[in-house]
UniProtKB/Swiss-Prot annotation:
GO molecular function: DNA binding
Biased composition (Basic and acidic residues): 137-160
DNA-binding region per Swiss-Prot/TrEMBL record: 14-107
Comp. bias regions, Acidic residues: 161-186, 212-227, 235-246
Keywords, alphabetical: DNA-binding, Nucleus, Transcription, Transcription regulation
Protein name: B3 domain-containing protein At4g34400
CDD domains: B3_DNA
A GO CC annotation given for this chain: nucleus
Organism phylogeny: Eukaryota, Viridiplantae, Streptophyta, Embryophyta, Tracheophyta
Region (Disordered), start-end ranges: 118-255
Organism of this sequence: Arabidopsis thaliana (Mouse-ear cress)
Length: 397
């Protein structure tokens, strides 16, 4: 009788909400700290996101930098639901490894009704244990981190019970510093909430344009100087528009059509030390000798870079984009010795382009500070659809 009464007393926790911002939430999504009080202490490592119409997606949970977040599987949820900047999402944990998700489109605040079902075969769940006391099982696979349980409570121990994973990306170990983590968690994420635009017409693609101040444009040369650039000799002729790179072809021909719709997105995240840090940077001479010999086509546009503190994205120099009138779509493919990896692009007002998932490239290639990477741009005319990566180890320079 007592057990039945206890079960009847169970109530679903309240919902938490978030506004989708592609610059921060394309690869992972952080669960608010204030919601930790409403999820079980033994939190599953794999959960189901049940979207509009009962459609489901399997998503992994992780603890990074004292935060619980949705990681593997979240980018697929974003793509399948075509989330755009300004979309409003609510989440409620139902106590059975399932989050009920509602989506409200930013352009009209209407609730989404249904999407395509994308539920993968469930595997045996491991758990993230949230407990008020340390537990010592002696297992080598356990990692202990201290995170706040809630805004008004003390700190609790988080024990992540790791499962063996055959994924080569998980097996590879990349160590730079405690500040460089694959979660792309940056101080920008916690400083301020950017202003989100509302589209006037449904169905139009949105291109992320980050406003940069006049000061940033004035110091463009300094801010981009941490990337070592070596440009291939290329004459842009009218007939070059029809030429294709022979080494690789995009999956769909229509990807060569770039979107030029530029809503006014103002990113107001402050970086007070940007100007000071930019002045301290010094340009470094290219270290790769005769880079053309590494390229699939010596005439392709290319630039040289190495492992930086800013690991979560690759920067394409604004001057390079201007010189060759380069165009990028919403996604571009990295190509390395492991294959192809699709990554989202972020386009700045001053024409620099940032490409996400660079951390994963660094990890799976086990890059070190002394290594150099030659980035070869594969294109149709001026449209860049892929970046071929040639890794030259420090000992070979």
């Amino acid at each position: 009788m007592a057990s039945s009464m206890a079960s009847n007393d169970f109530q679903l926790p309240p919902r938490f909400f978030t506004v989708f911002v592609s610059h921060f939430s394309s690869e992972f999504m952080v669960i608010p700290v204030s919601y930790y009080d409403h999820i079980p202490h033994r939190f599953p490592k794999t959960v189901i996101l049940r979207g509009p119409g009962g459609c489901s997606w399997k998503v992994a949970t992780e603890i990074k930098d004292d935060e619980v977040l949705f990681s593997q599987g979240w980018p697929k949820f974003v793509r399948d639901n075509t989330l755009n900047d300004g979309d409003f999402l609510t989440f409620a944990y139902n106590g059975a490894h399932i989050f009920e998700v509602s989506i409200f489109r930013g352009y009209d605040a209407c609730k989404e009704i249904s999407e395509v079902t994308e539920l993968e075969e469930e595997e045996e769940d491991s758990v993230i244990s949230l407990s008020s006391e340390d537990t010592d099982t002696g297992a080598k696979s356990e990692m202990k981190n201290t995170v706040p349980e809630g805004r008004d409570k003390g700190k609790s121990k988080v024990e992540v019970v790791e499962d063996s994973d055959d994924d080569e990306e998980e097996d590879s170990v990349y160590s730079e510093s405690s500040e460089e983590t694959e979660t792309d968690t940056d101080s920008e994420f916690k400083v301020a909430k950017p202003t989100i635009p509302k589209s006037q017409k449904k169905g139009k693609k949105k291109e992320q344009v980050v406003e940069s101040s006049d000061d940033e444009e004035d110091e463009e040369e300094d801010s981009d100087s941490d990337y070592i650039e070596t440009f291939g000799q290329l004459d842009i002729e009218e007939n070059s528009i029809s030429e294709e790179d022979s080494s690789y072809a995009p999956d769909k021909e229509d990807t060569a059509t770039a979107s030029f719709v530029k809503p006014k997105v103002a990113n107001k995240v402050a970086n007070l030390k940007r100007k000071e840090a930019a002045k301290k940077r010094k340009k470094v001479d290219p270290m790769i000798k005769n880079p053309e010999r590494y390229l699939d086509d010596p005439k392709n546009i290319h630039f040289e870079t190495n492992v930086k503190n800013r690991l979560y994205e690759l920067l394409v120099h604004a001057q390079l984009v201007k010189d060759y009138c380069l165009r990028f779509g919403d996604y571009v493919n990295y190509i390395d010795r492991f294959g192809k990896l699709s990554a989202k692009t972020a386009k700045w007002k001053d024409q620099r382009v940032c490409i996400k998932r660079w951390m994963r490239i660094c990890k799976r290639n086990k890059l070190k500070k002394e290594d150099r990477i030659l980035c070869e741009l594969l294109r149709k005319g001026t449209f860049v659809y892929a970046i071929k990566l040639h890794v030259i180890r420090g000992k070979d320079l």
